[in-house]
Amino acid sequence: MPGYVLTYFPVRGRAEPIRLLLADQGISWKEDEVQIPDWFSGKDARKKEAVFGQLPQFQDGDYVLYQSNSILRYLGNKHGLTGANDEERGHIDMVNDGVEDLRQKYGRLIFFEYETGKDKYLKELPSQLDFFERILSKNANGSKFVVGQKISFADYNLLDILQCHLDLCSKSLSAYPLLTAYVERLVARPKISEYLKSDARNKRPITPKHKK
């Protein structure tokens, strides 16, 4: 197995779905932690080398990749987490894009609108969660994954953003039995469960705006 290096800030953020995938698949990786003040002040010289000036960065030997969803897809392709056929692959990409839409809305709330917009956000959240509940219902009556019989890279992304919303409001999934069971099922996977209990996971806040 090649040596993987994940470069990111000391938070969960956009790197967390990648970590969930690696942990669940039993793949070891090294964390290369970048201090947030050094990055945004330009003190950390790696910012000049970063494509789009953003993290996370993922390194697989000599190969370097940026953009969290591209990294997830790369790992999905490499480790058989992209579906069994073209139709499943297309559907997995669609779900992952839907997660990205929700993640961007969540990010705007946390970083820019939390004090004034949280109530409105939670009131409108069902309009987003309805989509994912419906997606689950169409695959084995919601008893499996977003697509097919095997976990995909999109599942790790969806799990993470759902956990973010449970942190935001513990009742955010209460009206969604399939999503609730889905989260419970995935966090019970032995290697995910082990990772979620680890010091490495729990020392990192969700974002810089969150307290540890």
Swiss-Prot record:
Q: Where, by tissue, is this protein expressed? A: Expressed only in embryos. Not expressed in liver, lung, heart, kidney and ovary.
Query: Where does the GST N-terminal domain lie?
Result: 2-83
Keyword terms, alphabetized: Cytoplasm, Mitochondrion, Nucleus, Transferase
- Nucleotidyltransferase listed as a keyword: no
Recorded E.C. number(s)?
2.5.1.18
Alphabetized Pfam families for the sequence: GST_C_3, GST_N
Q: Name one GO molecular function term.
A: glutathione transferase activity
Which segments constitute the GST C-terminal domain? Answer: 85-206
Q: What is its main location?
A: cytoplasm
Q: Where does glutathione bind?
A: Y8, R14, W39, K47, Q54, L55, Q67, S68
Show the InterPro entries listed in the entry.
Glutathione-S-Trfase_C-like, Glutathione-S-Trfase_C_sf, Glutathione_S-Trfase_N, GST_C, GST_pi, GST_superfamily, Thioredoxin-like_sf
Reaction equation(s) it catalyzes:
RX + glutathione = an S-substituted glutathione + a halide anion + H(+)
- Note the subunit structure: Homodimer.
Q: What does this protein do?
A: Conjugation of reduced glutathione to a wide number of exogenous and endogenous hydrophobic electrophiles. Highly active towards 1-chloro-2,4-dinitrobenzene and organic isothiocyanates, but shows no detectable activity towards 1,2-dichloro-4-nitrobenzene, p-nitrobenzylchloride, trans-4-phenyl-3-buten-2-one (tPBO) and ethacrynic acid. May be associated with cellular proliferation.
The entry assigns this protein to a family as follows:
Belongs to the GST superfamily. Pi family.
Name of the protein = Glutathione S-transferase P 1
Give me the gene this protein comes from: gstp1
